[in-house]
Protein backbone atom coordinates (compact mmCIF):
# COMPACT_ATOMS: atom_id res chain seq x y z
CA UNK A 1 0.00 0.00 0.00
CA UNK A 2 1.29 3.43 -0.94
CA UNK A 3 0.44 6.55 1.04
CA UNK A 4 0.57 10.06 -0.33
CA UNK A 5 -0.03 13.13 1.81
CA UNK A 6 -0.88 16.51 0.31
CA UNK A 7 -2.36 19.86 1.15
CA UNK A 8 -5.34 20.64 -1.04
CA UNK A 9 -5.97 24.16 -2.47
CA UNK A 10 -8.59 24.61 0.24
CA UNK A 11 -5.90 24.16 2.88
CA UNK A 12 -7.23 20.80 4.01
CA UNK A 13 -4.59 18.15 4.65
CA UNK A 14 -5.41 14.91 2.81
CA UNK A 15 -3.86 11.46 2.68
CA UNK A 16 -4.35 9.12 -0.26
CA UNK A 17 -3.78 5.36 -0.05
CA UNK A 18 -3.12 3.32 -3.22
CA UNK A 19 -2.85 -0.40 -3.91
CA UNK A 20 -0.09 -2.08 -5.97
CA UNK A 21 -2.00 -1.33 -9.18
CA UNK A 22 -2.03 2.38 -8.36
CA UNK A 23 -5.70 2.50 -7.58
CA UNK A 24 -6.83 4.76 -4.76
CA UNK A 25 -8.42 2.67 -2.02
CA UNK A 26 -8.78 5.20 0.80
CA UNK A 27 -8.65 8.91 1.39
CA UNK A 28 -8.29 10.62 4.78
CA UNK A 29 -8.75 14.31 5.55
CA UNK A 30 -8.29 16.70 8.43
CA UNK A 31 -11.08 19.13 7.53
CA UNK A 32 -10.76 21.49 10.51
CA UNK A 33 -6.97 21.65 10.72
CA UNK A 34 -6.64 20.33 14.27
CA UNK A 35 -4.15 17.66 13.27
CA UNK A 36 -6.64 14.80 13.54
CA UNK A 37 -8.25 12.91 10.70
CA UNK A 38 -12.03 13.44 10.70
CA UNK A 39 -13.05 12.20 7.25
CA UNK A 40 -12.41 8.77 5.72
CA UNK A 41 -13.40 7.89 2.15
CA UNK A 42 -13.15 4.27 0.94
CA UNK A 43 -13.14 3.23 -2.73
CA UNK A 44 -13.87 -0.08 -4.44
CA UNK A 45 -11.77 -1.65 -7.21
CA UNK A 46 -13.59 0.37 -9.83
CA UNK A 47 -12.48 3.58 -8.15
CA UNK A 48 -15.94 4.68 -7.03
CA UNK A 49 -16.80 5.65 -3.47
CA UNK A 50 -17.93 2.68 -1.39
CA UNK A 51 -18.09 4.17 2.10
CA UNK A 52 -17.56 7.51 3.81
CA UNK A 53 -16.95 7.94 7.53
CA UNK A 54 -17.14 11.30 9.32
CA UNK A 55 -16.08 12.47 12.75
CA UNK A 56 -18.43 15.42 13.27
CA UNK A 57 -17.55 16.11 16.91
CA UNK A 58 -13.79 15.84 16.25
CA UNK A 59 -13.04 13.31 18.97
CA UNK A 60 -11.03 11.14 16.57
CA UNK A 61 -13.79 8.54 16.07
CA UNK A 62 -16.33 8.31 13.26
CA UNK A 63 -19.92 9.33 14.09
CA UNK A 64 -21.43 8.99 10.62
CA UNK A 65 -21.08 6.13 8.13
CA UNK A 66 -22.38 6.55 4.58
CA UNK A 67 -22.59 3.48 2.32
CA UNK A 68 -22.69 3.79 -1.48
CA UNK A 69 -23.89 1.64 -4.36
CA UNK A 70 -22.97 2.58 -7.91
CA UNK A 71 -21.42 5.79 -6.64
CA UNK A 72 -24.66 6.93 -4.98
CA UNK A 73 -25.47 7.01 -1.26
CA UNK A 74 -27.66 4.06 -0.28
CA UNK A 75 -27.56 4.03 3.51
CA UNK A 76 -26.29 6.24 6.31
CA UNK A 77 -25.71 5.30 9.93
CA UNK A 78 -25.29 7.86 12.71
CA UNK A 79 -24.15 7.81 16.32
CA UNK A 80 -25.66 11.06 17.59
CA UNK A 81 -24.95 10.87 21.33
CA UNK A 82 -21.25 9.85 21.40
CA UNK A 83 -21.88 6.48 23.07
CA UNK A 84 -20.45 4.50 20.16
CA UNK A 85 -23.82 2.95 19.26
CA UNK A 86 -25.69 3.56 16.05
CA UNK A 87 -29.03 5.26 16.76
CA UNK A 88 -30.07 6.65 13.38
CA UNK A 89 -30.31 4.95 9.99
CA UNK A 90 -31.07 6.77 6.73
CA UNK A 91 -31.95 5.07 3.43
CA UNK A 92 -31.75 6.79 0.05
CA UNK A 93 -33.50 6.24 -3.29
CA UNK A 94 -31.76 6.16 -6.67
CA UNK A 95 -31.83 9.96 -6.82
CA UNK A 96 -29.89 10.24 -3.58
CA UNK A 97 -32.97 11.53 -1.74
CA UNK A 98 -33.85 10.33 1.75
CA UNK A 99 -36.55 7.69 1.45
CA UNK A 100 -36.64 6.39 5.00
CA UNK A 101 -35.14 7.34 8.33
CA UNK A 102 -35.05 5.06 11.36
CA UNK A 103 -34.28 6.30 14.88
CA UNK A 104 -33.49 4.49 18.11
CA UNK A 105 -35.29 6.60 20.73
CA UNK A 106 -34.81 4.14 23.63
CA UNK A 107 -31.04 3.57 23.44
CA UNK A 108 -31.33 -0.21 22.95
CA UNK A 109 -29.80 -0.30 19.47
CA UNK A 110 -33.14 -0.90 17.73
CA UNK A 111 -35.19 1.57 15.70
CA UNK A 112 -38.41 2.80 17.35
CA UNK A 113 -39.34 5.52 14.88
CA UNK A 114 -39.55 5.12 11.12
CA UNK A 115 -39.81 8.27 8.99
CA UNK A 116 -40.86 7.92 5.35
CA UNK A 117 -40.14 10.68 2.83
CA UNK A 118 -41.21 11.47 -0.71
CA UNK A 119 -40.06 14.32 -2.96
CA UNK A 120 -37.98 15.87 -0.17
CA UNK A 121 -40.99 16.01 2.17
CA UNK A 122 -42.13 13.86 5.09
CA UNK A 123 -44.84 11.40 4.10
CA UNK A 124 -45.42 9.29 7.20
CA UNK A 125 -43.85 8.55 10.58
CA UNK A 126 -44.36 5.28 12.43
CA UNK A 127 -43.37 4.99 16.10
CA UNK A 128 -43.04 2.37 18.79
CA UNK A 129 -43.38 4.80 21.68
CA UNK A 130 -43.53 2.13 24.40
CA UNK A 131 -40.58 0.08 23.16
CA UNK A 132 -42.66 -3.08 22.89
CA UNK A 133 -41.70 -3.87 19.30
CA UNK A 134 -45.05 -2.76 17.89
CA UNK A 135 -45.96 0.47 16.08
CA UNK A 136 -48.43 2.38 18.26
CA UNK A 137 -48.33 5.83 16.67
CA UNK A 138 -48.52 6.83 13.00
CA UNK A 139 -48.20 10.43 11.83
CA UNK A 140 -49.31 11.34 8.31
CA UNK A 141 -48.16 14.46 6.46
CA UNK A 142 -49.53 16.50 3.58
CA UNK A 143 -47.46 19.21 1.88
CA UNK A 144 -44.91 18.87 4.67
CA UNK A 145 -47.43 19.47 7.48
CA UNK A 146 -49.06 17.00 9.86
CA UNK A 147 -52.49 15.96 8.55
CA UNK A 148 -53.40 13.00 10.77
CA UNK A 149 -52.08 11.10 13.78
CA UNK A 150 -53.21 7.57 14.67
CA UNK A 151 -52.46 6.11 18.10
CA UNK A 152 -52.80 2.73 19.81
CA UNK A 153 -53.11 3.77 23.47
CA UNK A 154 -53.90 0.28 24.79
CA UNK A 155 -51.01 -1.52 23.09
CA UNK A 156 -53.20 -4.17 21.45
CA UNK A 157 -52.07 -3.42 17.90
CA UNK A 158 -55.26 -1.52 17.00
CA UNK A 159 -55.39 2.23 16.54
CA UNK A 160 -57.98 3.82 18.83
CA UNK A 161 -57.22 7.55 18.73
CA UNK A 162 -57.23 9.64 15.55
CA UNK A 163 -56.22 13.31 15.43
CA UNK A 164 -56.87 15.44 12.34
CA UNK A 165 -55.02 18.62 11.40
CA UNK A 166 -55.49 21.52 8.98
CA UNK A 167 -52.46 23.68 8.14
CA UNK A 168 -50.62 21.92 10.95
CA UNK A 169 -53.29 22.82 13.56
CA UNK A 170 -55.32 20.21 15.43
CA UNK A 171 -59.01 20.54 14.44
CA UNK A 172 -60.58 17.19 15.39
CA UNK A 173 -59.85 14.16 17.53
CA UNK A 174 -61.73 10.85 17.48
CA UNK A 175 -61.35 8.19 20.19
CA UNK A 176 -62.45 4.57 20.55
CA UNK A 177 -62.58 4.53 24.36
CA UNK A 178 -63.91 0.99 24.66
CA UNK A 179 -61.36 -0.42 22.17
CA UNK A 180 -64.07 -2.22 20.21
CA UNK A 181 -63.33 -0.65 16.83
CA UNK A 182 -66.03 2.04 17.16
CA UNK A 183 -65.44 5.75 17.67
CA UNK A 184 -67.38 7.00 20.70
CA UNK A 185 -65.72 10.35 21.46
CA UNK A 186 -65.21 13.30 19.12
CA UNK A 187 -63.30 16.47 20.04
CA UNK A 188 -63.26 19.67 17.97
CA UNK A 189 -60.54 22.32 18.30
CA UNK A 190 -59.83 25.93 17.37
CA UNK A 191 -56.42 27.47 17.92
CA UNK A 192 -55.29 24.22 19.59
CA UNK A 193 -58.06 24.61 22.23
CA UNK A 194 -60.91 22.16 22.70
CA UNK A 195 -64.21 23.92 21.91
CA UNK A 196 -66.64 20.99 21.62
CA UNK A 197 -66.73 17.35 22.62
CA UNK A 198 -69.31 14.78 21.52
CA UNK A 199 -69.84 11.38 23.17
CA UNK A 200 -71.63 8.20 22.13
CA UNK A 201 -73.04 6.80 25.37
CA UNK A 202 -74.67 3.57 24.13
CA UNK A 203 -72.40 2.32 21.35
CA UNK A 204 -74.60 3.03 18.33
CA UNK A 205 -72.03 5.36 16.76
CA UNK A 206 -74.11 8.51 17.31
CA UNK A 207 -73.31 11.31 19.78
CA UNK A 208 -75.65 11.46 22.79
CA UNK A 209 -73.79 14.06 24.85
CA UNK A 210 -72.20 17.31 23.66
CA UNK A 211 -69.94 19.46 25.83
CA UNK A 212 -68.95 23.01 24.86
CA UNK A 213 -65.76 24.62 26.18
CA UNK A 214 -64.40 28.13 26.55
CA UNK A 215 -60.81 28.72 27.71
CA UNK A 216 -60.56 25.09 28.76
CA UNK A 217 -63.74 25.07 30.90
CA UNK A 218 -67.13 23.51 30.18
CA UNK A 219 -69.81 26.18 29.57
CA UNK A 220 -72.65 24.05 28.19
CA UNK A 221 -73.70 20.42 28.08
CA UNK A 222 -76.42 18.82 25.92
CA UNK A 223 -77.49 15.22 26.31
CA UNK A 224 -79.88 12.68 24.85
CA UNK A 225 -80.03 10.69 28.09
CA UNK A 226 -82.82 8.37 26.93
CA UNK A 227 -81.20 7.59 23.54
CA UNK A 228 -84.37 8.68 21.73
CA UNK A 229 -82.61 10.78 19.13
CA UNK A 230 -83.38 14.13 20.78
CA UNK A 231 -81.87 16.36 23.43
CA UNK A 232 -83.60 15.98 26.80
CA UNK A 233 -81.03 17.68 29.04
CA UNK A 234 -79.17 20.99 28.70
CA UNK A 235 -76.85 22.31 31.41
CA UNK A 236 -74.98 25.63 31.68
CA UNK A 237 -71.79 26.11 33.71
CA UNK A 238 -69.84 29.09 35.01
CA UNK A 239 -66.27 28.75 36.32
CA UNK A 240 -66.71 25.00 36.49
CA UNK A 241 -69.96 25.09 38.49
CA UNK A 242 -73.44 24.10 37.33
CA UNK A 243 -75.74 27.17 37.18
CA UNK A 244 -78.70 26.01 35.05
CA UNK A 245 -80.30 22.73 34.05
CA UNK A 246 -83.08 22.51 31.46
CA UNK A 247 -84.61 19.07 30.97
CA UNK A 248 -87.44 16.98 29.58
CA UNK A 249 -88.73 15.52 32.84
CA UNK A 250 -91.51 13.41 31.29
CA UNK A 251 -89.76 11.94 28.25
CA UNK A 252 -92.31 13.65 26.01
CA UNK A 253 -89.74 15.17 23.70
CA UNK A 254 -90.31 18.64 25.15
CA UNK A 255 -88.00 20.45 27.54
CA UNK A 256 -90.25 21.41 30.44
CA UNK A 257 -88.28 21.94 33.66
CA UNK A 258 -85.59 24.49 34.52
CA UNK A 259 -83.35 24.32 37.60
CA UNK A 260 -81.15 27.21 38.74
CA UNK A 261 -78.18 26.71 41.07
CA UNK A 262 -75.92 28.93 43.13
CA UNK A 263 -72.70 27.66 44.71
CA UNK A 264 -73.81 24.12 43.95
CA UNK A 265 -77.23 24.41 45.64
CA UNK A 266 -80.67 24.49 44.00
CA UNK A 267 -82.28 27.93 44.45
CA UNK A 268 -85.12 27.95 41.88
CA UNK A 269 -87.14 25.66 39.67
CA UNK A 270 -89.50 26.52 36.80
CA UNK A 271 -91.92 24.11 35.15
CA UNK A 272 -94.08 23.99 32.06
CA UNK A 273 -96.84 21.87 33.59
CA UNK A 274 -99.24 21.83 30.62
CA UNK A 275 -96.74 21.35 27.79
CA UNK A 276 -97.58 24.56 25.92
CA UNK A 277 -93.94 25.63 25.72
CA UNK A 278 -94.21 28.28 28.47
CA UNK A 279 -93.21 28.01 32.10
CA UNK A 280 -96.17 28.39 34.46
CA UNK A 281 -94.83 27.29 37.86
CA UNK A 282 -91.89 28.80 39.73
CA UNK A 283 -90.49 27.24 42.93
CA UNK A 284 -87.97 28.94 45.22
CA UNK A 285 -85.60 27.06 47.53
CA UNK A 286 -83.50 27.94 50.55
CA UNK A 287 -81.21 25.37 52.13
CA UNK A 288 -82.74 22.76 49.79
CA UNK A 289 -86.28 23.40 51.12
CA UNK A 290 -89.21 24.98 49.28
CA UNK A 291 -89.95 28.48 50.62
CA UNK A 292 -92.23 29.94 47.94
CA UNK A 293 -94.15 29.07 44.76
CA UNK A 294 -95.45 31.28 41.98
CA UNK A 295 -97.88 30.06 39.33
CA UNK A 296 -99.64 31.20 36.16
CA UNK A 297 -103.01 29.43 35.94
CA UNK A 298 -104.53 31.21 32.91
CA UNK A 299 -101.60 31.12 30.46
CA UNK A 300 -101.09 34.89 30.31
CA UNK A 301 -97.47 34.46 31.49
CA UNK A 302 -98.17 36.54 34.62
CA UNK A 303 -98.12 35.26 38.19
CA UNK A 304 -101.60 34.86 39.73
CA UNK A 305 -100.87 32.46 42.61
CA UNK A 306 -98.30 32.95 45.38
CA UNK A 307 -97.70 30.11 47.85
CA UNK A 308 -95.55 30.39 50.99
CA UNK A 309 -93.90 27.56 52.93
CA UNK A 310 -92.39 27.11 56.36
CA UNK A 311 -90.18 24.14 57.18
CA UNK A 312 -91.13 22.75 53.79
CA UNK A 313 -94.90 22.89 54.46
CA UNK A 314 -97.50 25.13 52.80
CA UNK A 315 -98.75 27.80 55.24
CA UNK A 316 -100.30 30.49 53.02
CA UNK A 317 -101.49 30.99 49.48
CA UNK A 318 -102.44 34.29 47.80
CA UNK A 319 -104.50 34.27 44.60
CA UNK A 320 -105.32 36.80 41.91
CA UNK A 321 -108.78 35.53 40.92
CA UNK A 322 -109.45 38.48 38.61
CA UNK A 323 -106.11 38.15 36.78
CA UNK A 324 -105.40 41.86 37.16
CA UNK A 325 -102.12 41.56 39.02
CA UNK A 326 -103.69 42.08 42.47
CA UNK A 327 -104.48 39.65 45.27
CA UNK A 328 -108.20 38.96 45.78
CA UNK A 329 -108.10 35.82 47.97
CA UNK A 330 -105.87 34.45 50.70
CA UNK A 331 -105.79 30.99 52.27
CA UNK A 332 -103.99 29.69 55.35
CA UNK A 333 -102.92 26.05 55.69
CA UNK A 334 -101.94 23.60 58.38
CA UNK A 335 -100.85 20.04 57.70
CA UNK A 336 -101.96 20.44 54.08
CA UNK A 337 -105.51 21.58 54.95
CA UNK A 338 -107.11 25.04 54.59
CA UNK A 339 -107.76 26.41 58.08
CA UNK A 340 -108.79 29.95 57.18
CA UNK A 341 -109.83 31.92 54.12
CA UNK A 342 -109.71 35.68 53.63
CA UNK A 343 -111.16 37.90 50.96
CA UNK A 344 -108.72 40.61 49.94
CA UNK A 345 -109.64 43.85 48.17
CA UNK A 346 -107.14 44.11 45.31
CA UNK A 347 -104.04 43.99 47.48
CA UNK A 348 -100.62 44.44 45.94
CA UNK A 349 -98.54 41.23 45.89
CA UNK A 350 -95.92 41.00 48.59
CA UNK A 351 -93.21 41.63 46.00
CA UNK A 352 -93.10 42.16 42.21
CA UNK A 353 -92.86 38.93 40.21
CA UNK A 354 -91.25 38.59 36.82
CA UNK A 355 -93.30 37.25 33.93
CA UNK A 356 -92.87 33.65 32.86
CA UNK A 357 -90.73 33.10 29.76
CA UNK A 358 -90.99 30.42 27.13
CA UNK A 359 -88.86 27.31 27.25
CA UNK A 360 -87.32 28.32 23.92
CA UNK A 361 -86.34 31.74 25.25
CA UNK A 362 -84.52 30.13 28.15
CA UNK A 363 -82.84 27.64 25.83
CA UNK A 364 -81.69 30.52 23.62
CA UNK A 365 -80.21 32.30 26.64
CA UNK A 366 -78.28 29.21 27.61
CA UNK A 367 -77.09 28.59 24.04
CA UNK A 368 -75.92 32.21 23.71
CA UNK A 369 -72.81 31.13 25.64
CA UNK A 370 -71.75 29.18 22.55
CA UNK A 371 -71.21 30.99 19.20
CA UNK A 372 -73.25 29.48 16.38
CA UNK A 373 -70.14 28.50 14.42
CA UNK A 374 -69.04 26.23 17.27
CA UNK A 375 -72.35 24.44 17.83
CA UNK A 376 -72.96 20.84 16.91
CA UNK A 377 -75.70 19.86 14.52
CA UNK A 378 -78.55 19.89 17.00
CA UNK A 379 -80.37 16.73 17.88
CA UNK A 380 -84.07 17.49 17.45
CA UNK A 381 -85.93 19.28 20.24
CA UNK A 382 -89.69 19.21 19.98
CA UNK A 383 -91.26 22.64 20.34
CA UNK A 384 -94.79 23.74 21.09
CA UNK A 385 -97.84 21.71 22.16
Predicted regions and their residues:
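Acidic, glycine-anchored loop motifs typical of Ca2+
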Residues: 10-11, 33-37, 58-62, 82-86, ...
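Conserved positions within tandem-repeat grammars
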Residues: 16, 38-41, 63-66, 87-90, ...
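Acidic, divalent-cation-chelating loop motifs in proteins
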Residues: 17, 28-32, 53-57, 66, ...
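Pro/Ala/Gly-rich low-complexity, hydrophilic intrinsically disordered segments
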Residues: 91, 96-99, 116-119, 140-145, ...
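Eukaryotic tandem repeat interaction scaffolds
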Residues: 179, 201-203, 207, 211-214, ...
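Ankyrin-repeat and related helical/solenoid repeat scaffolds used for protein-protein interactions
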Residues: 282-340
